């Protein structure tokens, strides 16, 4: 069976970009069980409530839902277990220093496969205030209206 090439996205955390200002992003490997990998290959995962924390100088991803594999037996995994993230020591130190500052947190942004290996994109982020969220929504709506207007203008010309 040939190896997959490229990047196959399994799940994205769209809520994270809405609730946080993402400052830095990192790509991390994930320590997974076999049935978790098989479930991910089927495209099953949810990152909505996911977050990352440090335990014993290691970064762990929590509250990510990877459902049990359908054909799995007693070897199946727990759907919402804690999963270890694999990063270089220097990256871990840099992230932990940033998170120790007030208001910063680590959120998983995207779960994907690169050359057959499961990876997660994590972001060091600061929470948005309510008026920031409203302002972002307003800007997106204005951009949509401008795009719609440009399309209609181009259709009238053509």
From Swiss-Prot:
Family annotation (SUPFAM superfamilies): Small protein B (SmpB)
Highest taxon listed in the record's lineage: Bacteria
Residues covered by region (Disordered): 133-158
Signal sequence, start to end: none
Annotated PROSITE patterns: SSRP (PS01317)
GO process annotations (BP): trans-translation
Basic and acidic residues: bias regions: 133-152
Keywords: Cytoplasm, RNA-binding
Subcellular location: Cytoplasm
A GO MF label: RNA binding
InterPro entries linked to this entry: SmpB (IPR023620), SsrA-bd_prot (IPR000037), SsrA-bd_prot_CS (IPR020081)
GO CC annotation: cytosol
Function of the protein: Required for rescue of stalled ribosomes mediated by trans-translation. Binds to transfer-messenger RNA (tmRNA), required for stable association of tmRNA with ribosomes. tmRNA and SmpB together mimic tRNA shape, replacing the anticodon stem-loop with SmpB. tmRNA is encoded by the ssrA gene; the 2 termini fold to resemble tRNA(Ala) and it encodes a 'tag peptide', a short internal open reading frame. During trans-translation Ala-aminoacylated tmRNA acts like a tRNA, entering the A-site of stalled ribosomes, displacing the stalled mRNA.
UniProt xrefs under PANTHER family: SSRA-BINDING PROTEIN, TMRNA-BINDING COMPONENT OF TRANS-TRANSLATION TAGGING COMPLEX
Family to which this protein belongs: Belongs to the SmpB family.
Name of the molecule in the record: SsrA-binding protein
Protein's gene: smpB
């Amino acid at each position: 069976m040939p190896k997959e090439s490229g990047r196959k996205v399994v799940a994205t955390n769209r809520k994270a970009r809405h609730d946080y200002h993402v400052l830095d992003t990192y790509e991390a490997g994930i320590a997974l069980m076999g049935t978790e990998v098989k479930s991910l290959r089927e495209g099953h995962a949810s990152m909505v409530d996911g977050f990352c924390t440090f335990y014993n100088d290691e970064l762990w991803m929590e509250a990510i839902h990877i459902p049990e594999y359908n054909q799995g037996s007693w070897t199946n995994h727990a759907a919402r277990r804690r999963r270890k993230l694999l990063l270089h020591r220097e990256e871990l130190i840099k992230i932990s220093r940033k998170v120790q500052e007030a208001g910063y947190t680590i959120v998983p942004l995207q779960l994907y496969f690169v050359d057959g290996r499961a990876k997660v994109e994590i972001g060091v982020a600061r929470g948005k205030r309510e008026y920031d969220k409203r302002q972002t929504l307003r800007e997106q709506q204005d951009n949509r209206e401008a795009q719609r207007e440009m399309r209609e203008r181009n259709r009238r010309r053509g």
